[in-house]
């Protein structure tokens, strides 16, 4: 249909940054004031995602942004930043191109769901 997708919260409110895989939010972090987000997270998935990234010499940010950018329907990745170095990191984060094996491994970590809406 020629539609594009603009993913909102490409880092899952920060869960895909690696900062929260221990299950605790660092003081002053965005999720420190939103404990319900971290409480609902699957920490095993977050740790497996971090392992996946490190095995490839990447950061979680690079994997998340690059995977999204590699999707044909994705027209852009919304990349918020609170510090200047984050702008640079975000811009450089889409250089990795996942292989079919990488995509299969990510599907094992985050199995596709049947329904993504609340209705």
Walk through the language-model features, giving the residues of each.
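Glycine-rich, positively charged active-site loop/lid region within alpha/beta enzyme cores that binds
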Residues: 1-52, 116-119
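Compositionally biased, intrinsically disordered/low-complexity regions enriched for serine, proline
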Residues: 4-7, 69, 108
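Conserved short secondary-structure transition element at the edge of the structured enzyme core
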Residues: 10, 38-95
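Short secondary-structure boundary/hinge segments and terminal tails
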Residues: 15-16, 71, 86, 109
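Short alpha-helical linear motifs
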Residues: 22, 86-91, 104-105
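Short amphipathic alpha-helical leader/targeting segments
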Residues: 28, 32-33, 78, 94, ...
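Extended hydrophobic/aromatic segments used for targeting, binding, or gating
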Residues: 97-118
